[in-house]
A protein has these predicted regions:
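Nucleotide-sugar donor-binding catalytic core of glycosyltransferases
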Residues: 2-36, 40-205
């Protein structure tokens, strides 16, 4: 049996690289599942239908460990394929709120896992942004950012609400040029997204 790692979205690429290098596991670039192998999957919500279909087609001769990062209000929990994928495989999550939600609402057994280490990136010589925020747009985030900019007109803000920095390299560059990174939840009652904090700390913020 071999253990391999899959990244379903570019935002999880660094996590996948660190895990594979630390444990000397193969990072799959072209997914061709083999019998008896175990696949650790970051961002499985993006690939739910494909992952489930492959498992059915190969008669469950291989397994997944799903590292869920979605919050309890996520639209992906309305995806029947993602729920079925989690019910058929091992699921791990980084916060107890989502673990309890999945158990109670979908009868999905969830294990907790530790915070993965990030690579330490070289720091930029000059941090040109005082405050940085990158994330999806919603009313609360927009209103909060507008208030901060009005209250602190002398600070230089970098704000991206359109996810222009989806790639790891692009995101790392911006964070390495920022002094402070804001971590604002998208959903109400959000769990603390420690993986975002780890990324910012790795970039010296």
């Amino acid at each position: 049996m071999s253990i391999k790692v899959i990244s379903g979205h570019s935002v999880f690429n660094e996590n996948a690289v660190v895990l594979s290098q630390k444990n000397k596991w193969t990072l799959e670039k072209e997914f061709n599942p083999q019998a008896n192998d175990l696949y650790i999957v970051f961002g499985a919500h993006e690939l739910a239908h494909q992952l489930l279909e492959l498992q059915y087609r190969k008669n469950s001769s291989f397994g997944y460990v799903i590292l869920n990062s979605e919050q309890i209000h996520s639209q992906f929990f309305k995806n029947k394929y993602y729920i079925q994928l989690m019910k058929r495989n091992v699921v791990c999550d980084y916060n107890t709120l989502t673990c309890d939600y999945l158990r109670q609402n979908f009868d999905v057994k969830v294990f907790s896992y530790y915070h993965f280490e990030f690579m330490k990136f070289p720091e930029e010589q000059q941090r040109i942004y005082d405050v940085c925020f990158i994330g999806s747009k919603n009313q609360h985030r927009e209103e909060t950012l507008n208030k901060l900019q009005d209250q602190f007109p002398n600070l230089k803000f970098y704000i991206d609400l359109e996810w222009k920095h989806g790639s790891s390299d692009s995101l790392t560059k911006i964070l390495s040029q920022s002094k402070v990174v804001l971590n604002m939840p998208f959903y109400q009652d959000n769990a603390l997204e420690t993986h975002r904090i780890n990324k910012a700390l790795a970039c010296g913020c």
